[in-house]
């Protein structure tokens, strides 16, 4: 965080920071092809309207991480930052129960011990939380995945509190974006952050200061509205949607690698047991 901290960093902490992170290439083969496998320092944006399976996918990936290797998991730690106060522990436990061959209380406790939860109620609190993570990341080399659900929670609040100044509207999220990039790079993490579709496709009336259309996104309907600092650090964008039927449990996603501009489409169902790819 600061020069004083860096001078105090021990050799053990340095090794933990640089060498102790497990590979996440096998996180979800159904979602990430070999060439798009997540690597340390990658930042993924999960984008879409409410109710399109973004948080369910986060539960799925979290379960994959915290399950023991003997049960097909990666046996690594996850930090989940909830800004909507929508995190459903019972839902995650249900997903884990369906994946544990012996769903004992002890086995469940061991899985959940690998999960760290933080709650934030404002963009400033999110920024302060991120600033406080460095000591945790140094001391927990098995903590490999950082999740923020959702990064767009405070968009309208920040826009109002910033008045007519675009710089003030975006100031805190810009700092959060820059800090997230530094943390995932220096500590060799993987970041998944969700953003909600607040801007209607083709609508210009509610454009934010950083909103822009992306013709190369084709029919995905992505409309950037968060600060340019965030748009710059994202390496992969995954657009979620729901099939036409209002109560359909079938969802679709389009994954776009922003450097190569390659697109991949997937479909999945949300069952009681969690996400199932079609």
UniProtKB/Swiss-Prot annotation:
Subcellular location: Nucleus
Family recorded in the similarity comment: Belongs to the RecA family. RAD51 subfamily.
Native source organism of the sequence: Mus musculus (Mouse)
Job description of the protein: Involved in the homologous recombination repair (HRR) pathway of double-stranded DNA, thought to repair chromosomal fragmentation, translocations and deletions. Part of the RAD51 paralog protein complex BCDX2 which acts in the BRCA1-BRCA2-dependent HR pathway. Upon DNA damage, BCDX2 acts downstream of BRCA2 recruitment and upstream of RAD51 recruitment. BCDX2 binds predominantly to the intersection of the four duplex arms of the Holliday junction and to junction of replication forks.
Keyword Nucleus among record annotations: yes
SUPFAM superfamilies the UniProt entry points to: P-loop containing nucleoside triphosphate hydrolases (SSF52540)
Tissue expr: Expressed at low level in somatic tissues and at high level in testis.
Record's protein name: DNA repair protein XRCC2
PROSITE patterns reported in the protein's UniProt record: RECA_2 (PS50162)
CDD domains with a match to the protein in the record: XRCC2
Residues recorded with modification Phosphoserine: 10
Keywords on record: DNA damage, DNA recombination, DNA repair, DNA-binding, Nucleus, Phosphoprotein
Gene Ontology CC annotations of this record: centrosome; nucleoplasm; Rad51B-Rad51C-Rad51D-XRCC2 complex; replication fork
GO biological process: centrosome cycle; DNA damage response; DNA strand invasion; double-strand break repair via homologous recombination; in utero embryonic development; mitotic cell cycle; multicellular organism growth; negative regulation of neuron apoptotic process
Subunit structure: Interacts with RAD51D. Part of the BCDX2 complex consisting of RAD51B, RAD51C, RAD51D and XRCC2; the complex has a ring-like structure arranged into a flat disk around a central channel. In the absence of DNA, the BCDX2 subcomplex XRCC2:RAD51D formed a multimeric ring structure; in the presence of single-stranded DNA it formed a filamentous structure with the ssDNA.
Molecular function GO labels: ATP binding; ATP-dependent DNA damage sensor activity; four-way junction DNA binding
Entry keyword annotation includes DNA repair: yes
């Amino acid at each position: 965080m600061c020069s004083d901290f860096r001078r105090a960093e021990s050799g053990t902490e340095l090794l933990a920071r640089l060498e102790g992170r497990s590979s996440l290439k096998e996180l979800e083969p159904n979602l990430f092809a070999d060439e798009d496998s997540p690597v340390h320092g990658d930042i993924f944006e999960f984008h879409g309207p409410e109710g399109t399976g973004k948080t369910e996918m986060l539960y799925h990936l979290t379960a994959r991480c915290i399950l023991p290797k003997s049960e097909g998991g990666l046996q690594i730690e996850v930090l989940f930052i909830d800004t909507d106060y929508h995190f459903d522990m019972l839902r995650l436990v249900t997903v884990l129960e369906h994946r544990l061959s012996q769903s004992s209380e002890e086995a469940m406790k061991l899985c959940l011990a690998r999960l760290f939860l933080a709650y934030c109620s404002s963009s400033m609190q999110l920024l302060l939380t991120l600033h406080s993570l460095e000591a945790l990341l140094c001391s927990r080399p098995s903590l490999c995945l950082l999740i923020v659900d959702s990064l767009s929670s405070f968009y309208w609040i920040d826009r109002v509190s910033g008045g007519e100044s675009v710089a003030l509207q975006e100031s805190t999220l810009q700092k959060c974006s820059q800090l997230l990039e530094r943390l995932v790079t220096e500590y060799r993490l993987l970041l998944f952050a969700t953003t909600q579709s607040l801007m209607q496709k083709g609508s210009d009336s509610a454009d934010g200061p950083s909103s822009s259309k992306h013709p190369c996104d084709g029919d995905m309907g992505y409309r950037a509205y968060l600060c340019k600092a965030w748009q710059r650090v994202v390496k992969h964008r995954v657009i979620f949607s729901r099939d036409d039927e209002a109560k359909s449990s079938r969802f679709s996603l389009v994954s776009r690698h922003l450097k190569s501009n390659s697109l991949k489409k997937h479909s999945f169902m949300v069952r009681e047991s969690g996400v199932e790819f079609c």
